[in-house]
A protein has these predicted regions:
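Hydrophobic single transmembrane helices highlighted by the model
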Residues: 1-22
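Intrinsic disorder/low-complexity segments enriched in polar/small residues
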Residues: 8, 49-50, 65, 149, ...
Length: 430
């Protein structure tokens, strides 16, 4: 039987009237169920999101609290480290010295170098009977070397514990040597004969107080031995660190003493020095020249003087307003005085000469950071030569390389210089 269009439409109408309501009801129920499921999922997501937001807020609050605690602890540590932490040398206010005008002295002619490796930290130089002597470090020990001025024939004279800070020859060949050891400073007498070298401790304390840091020594023909003590504060990290400490603190507690080997007594020659860093003895003029590190000057005092104060009666400022902080001193055969400079003048330090708080903070910095406060560049003056009688400047020795000047020694037409951190000696022609 054929179904026409009318019949087909009637069948579809009857089917829709019969099945349609049930299908519509089923679709409606399915849609409602889907909507409920979606709403429940949305509510669960909302709850989870709220929980996550609450957790984030709690973590953030904890982090903020920890950050505040950390900042407070860091601030307390910083205040303690830079302001409240005890230091051995409390800074004192002082008046910064003037700056000297240009002298017009000629530059020394270029020379050369002598390599001393494996020896390091050359701290003192002397000439005796045509030989050049040098104090250096060999491992952890101090070592005294002897060589020809051209570096040949190098031998070890002796080794000792600690750091040899300076040495001097007496007319009878005795070597007087100052050292810095773990127990403090020492003054030794060194004798040598066919049996070898003997080292005798002569001074380790003065009036019951241990030597802090003897930095220079000079021996007179009458047997008297003059030596310096850098400052009252103990040097725990070597001479270089002790010099920076006194330069920053400017305690003015450095001294010069004289030891009488016959009587075994020690007398005070000069006090009130802001870093007694160098010493030279002119026996013809009966004068001691003393480097004052912090005051940028050289004092002159009679060898017979006792209990004098720097700048007081019987102690005049022989050279002042120097371009750097003076260290080792030396006299040549003609009486010319050579002055070495540890560092160039620090504008920051002297601008804050009267401000103990900032200088106290600088004293509490690490050793590496303190080293950045002072420098001597290749363009600065490393050493100078002056005629003490007339005060006329003879020669200027330029920096050449960076690093503080630790020692110098005139030998004939040459001047030898040692620079911190190097294993070689520099020399120039004068």
């Amino acid at each position: 039987m054929r179904i026409g269009l009318v019949e087909l439409l009637l069948i579809l109408l009857i089917a829709s009237l019969t099945i349609g309501p049930s299908a519509a009801l089923w679709v409606d129920r399915w849609m409602r169920r889907a909507q409920k499921t979606s709403a429940a999922a949305a509510r669960r997501r909302a709850v989870q999101e709220a929980q996550r937001a609450a957790e984030r807020e709690e973590v953030l609050q904890r982090f903020q609290k920890l950050s505040i605690v950390f900042v407070l602890c860091a601030a307390v540590a910083l205040i303690w480290g830079l302001v409240l932490r005890p230091i051995e040398a409390a800074p004192t206010p002082y008046t910064a010295p003037d700056v000297r005008q240009e002298t017009g002295a000629q530059n020394a002619a270029e020379g050369g170098v002598l390599e001393l490796a494996p020896y390091t930290e050359i701290s003192a130089l002397r000439e005796n009977n045509g030989w050049l002597y040098a104090a250096a470090k060999s491992g952890k020990n101090g070592c005294l070397l002897r060589m020809q001025p051209d570096g040949t024939g190098r031998t070890e004279v002796l080794t000792t514990a600690g750091e040899i800070t300076d040495f001097a020859f007496a007319p009878d060949g005795t070597i007087w040597m100052t050292t810095l050891e773990s127990e403090g400073g020492r003054l030794y007498r060194v004798n040598s004969d066919q049996w070898g070298v003997t080292v005798e401790l002569t001074v380790s304390q003065i009036d019951g107080r241990a030597l802090s840091c003897p930095t220079a020594v000079a021996a007179a023909s009458d047997g008297a031995v003059y030596f310096t003590d850098l400052a009252a504060a103990r040097a725990r990290h070597g001479v270089e660190s002790a010099l920076r400490t006194e330069l920053t603190a400017h305690t003015g507690t450095g001294s010069v003493y004289v030891y009488d080997p016959a009587a075994r007594t020690v007398e005070t020659v000069l006090t009130g020095i802001a870093g007694a860093s160098g010493l030279a003895l002119d026996e013809a003029a009966e004068t001691l020249y003393v480097s004052d590190l912090g005051s940028r000057c050289v004092w002159a005092v009679d060898t017979a003087a006792r209990d004098r104060t720097a700048g007081g009666k019987g102690c005049s400022t022989h050279l002042y307003g120097l371009p750097g902080y003076p260290g080792a001193l030396a006299l040549d055969a003609d009486g010319t005085l050579y002055i070495s400079y540890r560092w160039a003048r620090s504008g920051w330090l002297e601008d804050h000469a009267g401000r103990t708080l900032l200088r106290g903070m600088a004293l509490r910095l690490s050793q590496t950071m303190q080293e950045g406060l002072f420098s001597l560049s290749a363009s600065d003056i490393r050493a100078e030569a002056v005629a003490p009688a007339s005060g006329s400047w003879q020669r200027t020795i330029p920096g050449g390389s960076s690093g503080s000047t630790t020692a110098l020694c005139p030998v004939g037409s040459r001047v030898y210089l040692a620079i911190s951190g190097e294993t070689k000696l520099h020399w120039v022609r004068v």
